[in-house]
Swiss-Prot record:
GO terms for biological process: translation. It comes from Amoebophilus asiaticus (strain 5a2). Keywords: Ribonucleoprotein, Ribosomal protein. Gene3D superfamilies: Glucose-6-phosphate isomerase like protein, domain 1 (3.40.50.10490), Helix hairpin bin (1.10.287.610). This is Small ribosomal subunit protein uS2. GO terms for cellular component: cytosolic small ribosomal subunit. GO terms for molecular function: structural constituent of ribosome. InterPro entries: Ribosomal_uS2, Ribosomal_uS2_bac/mit/plastid, Ribosomal_uS2_CS, Ribosomal_uS2_flav_dom_sf.
């Protein structure tokens, strides 16, 4: 649950929209009034939309999926990068590479190339190269790192996208829409809020306004991550309890179950005669015979094959 008030939003300038002549009619439900040629955003709508977006991001973080932050405008890139780093989430703040989402396999190849270049620059082979070759490799590595440095740990498509400016990040929005990835974005009075899933009516140009909204969304994500840790701890505890319960009813290894026939008398069972249980729950006693000292009539002594033959030596 967010704790922001209208006063907090007013102080940050969230309510200030664009010139009324530059408005997008789709933003009409979120506009409170027009003052001196400027549209004023309805902060009640901002709070309700912000709460919905925060709940969504909290659920995504709790599920274990990554949330990609996108902000390439000058006044937003630094604070967005810091927020994403603090949450261990991916971000793109320099330039959106076309196909980052729709051609994710190619982006992964570039990330692997960057990782390989970083390893090579630490090896003896790099040190033995000519200065010109070293400079070329370092320049290519820096270029890739500037663009892809924030998504090195993104091994699969993100669970959600957080966008600061819908118009400036239009390519990222299009790719996410094509793949069905939920989009949370600040929506100023000059944009189409229908392009994203969770528009937050807000000034997307003033740094204090951007910082306030992004920080609030970051807090929701952090809560989701904490819930995920609690869920894991509870699952581990339940598993240990179940294992303990299963071990209580288990027989020691090597122990055999001994059954007694219902047909046997109590006297027979008292002697400890073991029985084999059959499928129909009846049992036959297994008697233990001792060697007889008196030869059985008609039997041959051990070693004699036939009557009259001599015993074998």
């Amino acid at each position: 649950m967010i704790t922001l008030t209208q006063k907090d939003l007013l102080k940050a300038g969230v309510h200030l929209g664009h010139l009324s002549r530059k408005w997008n009619p789709s933003m009409a439900p979120f506009i409170f009034m027009e003052s001196r040629g400027i549209h004023i955003i309805d902060l009640n709508k901002t709070l309700s939309q912000l709460q919905e977006a925060a709940d969504t991001l909290q659920a995504v973080a709790r599920s274990g999926k990554k949330i990609l932050f996108v902000a390439t405008k000058k006044q937003a890139k630094e604070l967005v990068a810091q927020t994403a780093k603090s949450l261990n989430m991916p971000y793109m703040t320099e330039r959106w590479l076309g196909g980052t989402l729709t051609n994710f396999i190619t982006i992964r190849r570039l990330i692997k190339k960057l990782t390989s270049m970083e390893r090579m620059m630490k090896s003896a082979t790099y040190k033995n190269m000519a200065k010109k070759e070293q400079l070329m490799i370092a320049r290519d590595k820096d270029k890739l790192e500037r663009v892809l440095g924030g998504v090195l740990d993104l091994t699969k498509l993100p669970g959600a996208l957080v966008v600061v400016d819908i118009m400036k990040e239009s390519i990222a929005v299009q790719e996410a829409r094509k793949l069905g990835i939920p989009i949370i974005a600040l929506a100023d009075t000059n944009v189409d809020p229908d392009l994203v899933d969770y528009p937050i009516p807000s000034n997307d140009d003033a740094t204090p306004a951007i910082e306030l909204i992004v920080r609030t969304l970051g807090e929701a994500i952090n809560e989701g991550l904490s819930m995920r840790q609690e869920d894991k701890a509870a699952e581990a505890q339940d598993k240990d309890a179940q294992d303990t319960e299963d071990n209580k009813g288990a027989r020691p290894r090597g122990a055999e179950k001994v059954a007694y026939s219902d047909a046997d008398s109590e006297e027979d069972n008292a002697y400890g005669i073991a029985v084999k249980a059959s499928k129909n729950k009846t049992a036959e006693p297994v008697e233990r015979f001792k060697k007889s000292r008196t030869p059985v009539k008609g039997s041959r002594p051990i070693g004699v094959s036939k009557a009259g033959d001599k015993p074998k030596k």
